[in-house]
C-alpha cells in the first residue's frame, strides 16, 4: 500500500455552489507517484449501483475544488457519472511541501494519479475514464492525455497554456529572449534571497485590490469571480497567490509539445470574447497539425462568452455538449 500523508479535511459543505440533492458526496484521498497525497471531493448519483463511467476534474490554476471544478464534477455526477474534483499538489487540502508551488510535471502527474485512483475502484468502469481541465488545468489535461493512454476523452474548458503565458507574458507581449532573460534574472535573484531567509514570499494573488479603474476587463472579470461571488479561503487566487518563484519552471517546459500525438478524443471549449481564447484556438490548431488523429478533435466556441462564464455560469457552460462528447467517445 502506498504511504500517504495525513491531511486535515473539512467535514462540512464549504463549496461556492449549492449542494445537489441528486448526488452523494464524500471526501477521498489518493497519492501520486511523488508520494504527495491529494484531497478530492467524490460525487456519484444517489442510489448508485454497479460500475460507472468516471471523470476527474481540476482547475483553474490557483483555484480549489470548492470552486468551479467542484461545480463541474457535481453537475456531471447529476448526469450519471462518478466524478472527483481534486486539489492539485501543494494547494488546497492536498499535501505537498513547500506550499503554494506549481510544477508542469507534478501537476500533470496529479491528473494521472486521479486516473490511478478511479481505475481501481469497484464502482468505476476502468475502460470509461475521462478528464476535465479548467483554465490553466486545460493545458495540463492535454498534457496528461498525451501521456496517459487510459484516458478515453478529455475536455479543456476556457484553457490556458501555462508554459506559454509564463514564458511569453499575456498575449505573447514578452515573447523575446531579452524579456525572458530579464524575468529569469529577477526570479533567480529572488531564489537566492529567499533561500537565505529560509522562507518564500507570496506573489500577491490573482488580482490586486482595489482593482484599478483602468484595469483590463479580464482582470476585473477575475476579481469578480475570485474576490467576489466565489471567494474561498483556501483558494490561492482568492488570497495571496502562489509563491513568488512557484511557477518559474513553466518558462522552459512546454507542456503541449506532443499534443498532436493524442489518439483519444479531445474537446476544447472556449468563449469567443475570452481574453484567453487564443490559447484554445492555438492549442487546437497545434493538436491537429501534422496529426493522424484529427477526426475526434473539436474546438467549440461559445458566442459572446468571456473567460469566467465557463467557470460557473450554467447558462453558458455547455454541459449537454460535454455529456454528449463523453458518451460518443467511450465515457458514458
Model-derived features with residue positions:
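N-terminal cap/lid segment of alpha/beta-hydrolase-fold proteins
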Residues: 4-50, 311
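Short beta-strand element of the alpha/beta-hydrolase
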Residues: 51-60
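The serine-hydrolase catalytic nucleophile loop
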Residues: 62-74, 88, 280
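Conserved alpha/beta-hydrolase
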Residues: 75-95
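Alpha/beta-hydrolase active-site loop
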Residues: 101-122
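Alpha/beta-hydrolase-fold enzymes
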Residues: 142-228
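Short beta-strand/loop motif that positions the catalytic acidic residue
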Residues: 262, 268-270
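Catalytic histidine-centered segment of alpha/beta-hydrolase-like enzymes
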Residues: 305-315
Amino acid at each position: 500500500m502506498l504511504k500517504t500523508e495525513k491531511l486535515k479535511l473539512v467535514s462540512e459543505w464549504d463549496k461556492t455552489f449549492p449542494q445537489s440533492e441528486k448526488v452523494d458526496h464524500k471526501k477521498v484521498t489518493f497519492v501520486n507517484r511523488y508520494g504527495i497525497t491529494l484531497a478530492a471531493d467524490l460525487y456519484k448519483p444517489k442510489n448508485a449501483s454497479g460500475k460507472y463511467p468516471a471523470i476527474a476534474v481540476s482547475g483553474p490554476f490557483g483555484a480549489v475544488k470548492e470552486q468551479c471544478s467542484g461545480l463541474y464534477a457535481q453537475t456531471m455526477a447529476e448526469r450519471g457519472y462518478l466524478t472527483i474534483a481534486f486539489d492539485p499538489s501543494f494547494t488546497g487540502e492536498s499535501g505537498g511541501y513547500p506550499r503554494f508551488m506549481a510544477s508542469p510535471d507534478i501537476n500533470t502527474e496529479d491528473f494521472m494519479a486521479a486516473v490511478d485512483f478511479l481505475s481501481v475502484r469497484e464502482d468505476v468502469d476502468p475502460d470509461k475514464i475521462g478528464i476535465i481541465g479548467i483554465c490553466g488545468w486545460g493545458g495540463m489535461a492535454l498534457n496528461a492525455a498525451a501521456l496517459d493512454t487510459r484516458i478515453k476523452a478529455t475536455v479543456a474548458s476556457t484553457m490556458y497554456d501555462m508554459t506559454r503565458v509564463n514564458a511569453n507574458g499575456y498575449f505573447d507581449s514578452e515573447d523575446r529572449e531579452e524579456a525572458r532573460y530579464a524575468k529569469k534574472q529577477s526570479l533567480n535573484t529572488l531564489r537566492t534571497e529567499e533561500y537565505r531567509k529560509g522562507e518564500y514570499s507570496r506573489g500577491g494573488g490573482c488580482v490586486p485590490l482595489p482593482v484599478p479603474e483602468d484595469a483590463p476587463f479580464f482582470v476585473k472579470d477575475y476579481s469578480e469571480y475570485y474576490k467576489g461571488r466565489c471567494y474561498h479561503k483556501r483558494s490561492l487566487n482568492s488570497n495571496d497567490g502562489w509563491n513568488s518563484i512557484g511557477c518559474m519552471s513553466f518558462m522552459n517546459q512546454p507542456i503541449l509539445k506532443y499534443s498532436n500525438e493524442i489518439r483519444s478524443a479531445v474537446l476544447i471549449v472556449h468563449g469567443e470574447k475570452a481574453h484567453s481564447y487564443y490559447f484554445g484556438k492555438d492549442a487546437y490548431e497545434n493538436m491537429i497539425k501534422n496529426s493522424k488523429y484529427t477526426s475526434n478533435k473539436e474546438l467549440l466556441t461559445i458566442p459572446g462568452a468571456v473567460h469566467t462564464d465557463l467557470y460557473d455560469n450554467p447558462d453558458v457552460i455547455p454541459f449537454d455538449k460535454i455529456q454528449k462528447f463523453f458518451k460518443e467517445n467511450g465515457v458514458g
